[in-house]
């Protein structure tokens, strides 16, 4: 039950777009890295190293991303004009935005490469009877974590798909309680998407007033 409560806390913080979600995102994989290594679960060990790195990156991006982006734009001579009505803290923090179209192709390529690589490992080195579905959720989680770290509203699409597929996967495995949890996570992710859309529109209204 401890893991359930941690996941619910993480989802609640993510739903609210709270930067404190990254504290949980740093602590949990940091602990599991040692647990999985001692247990000899090297795939889980490896993915948690990625989650730890993504959480540290996400914290830095959410905390200082807007400042870094504004600095780059100034150097390029493409700064925005008009009165900035945000607080000093808001000027530093990364706002919720749409993912730029230029990232779609490389992110899709990373997803496909991860999907094929993980599936190959599961097929050849494990007794998994659902290697492709397992690989799909893991690969999409990798992409979703990157989108979350960049605070793109579309990250919720990834988690909706991951949670929905996971719910079906756990039903197939006979893990009804876990399937029910992931069905709940799917619903929360849908509400999270619309919550972030609303917050994004509010941020855009505050950012610049001509």
Give a label for each model feature:
Residues 44-48, 174-185:
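Loop-to-transmembrane alpha-helix initiation sites
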Residues 116-128, 135-153:
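Alpha-helical transmembrane segments in multipass membrane proteins, preferentially the mid-helix core
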Residues 12-23, 146-158:
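Membrane-helix interface "capping/anchor" motifs
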Residues 6-9, 102-121, 186-189:
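Hydrophobic core of alpha-helical transmembrane segments in multi-pass integral membrane proteins
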Residues 50-72:
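Membrane-water interface of transmembrane alpha-helices
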Residues 3, 44-52, 127-137:
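Structural signature of hydrophobic alpha-helical transmembrane segments
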Residues 4-5, 68-92, 96-97, 101, ...:
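Short, basic, low-complexity termini and linkers enriched in Ser/Thr/Gly/Pro
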Residues 1-5, 163:
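Short, small-residue-biased leader/transition segments that mark boundaries at the very start
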């Amino acid at each position: 039950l401890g893991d359930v409560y941690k996941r619910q806390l993480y989802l609640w913080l993510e739903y609210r777009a709270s930067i404190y979600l990254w504290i949980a995102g740093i602590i949990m994989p940091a602990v599991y890295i040692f647990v999985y290594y001692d247990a000899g679960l090297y795939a889980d060990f490896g993915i948690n190293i990625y989650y730890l790195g993504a959480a540290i990156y996400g914290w830095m991006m959410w905390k200082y991303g807007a400042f870094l982006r504004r600095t780059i734009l100034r150097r390029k001579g493409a700064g925005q004009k008009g009165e900035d009505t945000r607080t000093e803290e808001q000027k530093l923090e990364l706002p919720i935005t749409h993912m730029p179209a230029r990232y779609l192709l490389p992110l899709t390529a990373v997803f496909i490469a991860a999907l094929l690589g993980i599936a190959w490992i599961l097929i050849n080195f494990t007794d998994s009877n659902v290697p492709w579905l397992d690989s799909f959720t893991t690969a999409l989680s990798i992409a979703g974590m990157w989108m979350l770290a960049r605070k793109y509203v579309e990250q919720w699409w990834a988690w909706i798909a991951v949670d929905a597929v996971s719910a079906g996967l756990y039903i197939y495995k006979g893990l009804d309680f876990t399937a029910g949890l992931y069905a709940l996570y799917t619903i929360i992710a849908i509400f999270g998407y619309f919550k972030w859309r609303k917050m994004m529109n509010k941020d855009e209204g505050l950012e610049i007033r001509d």
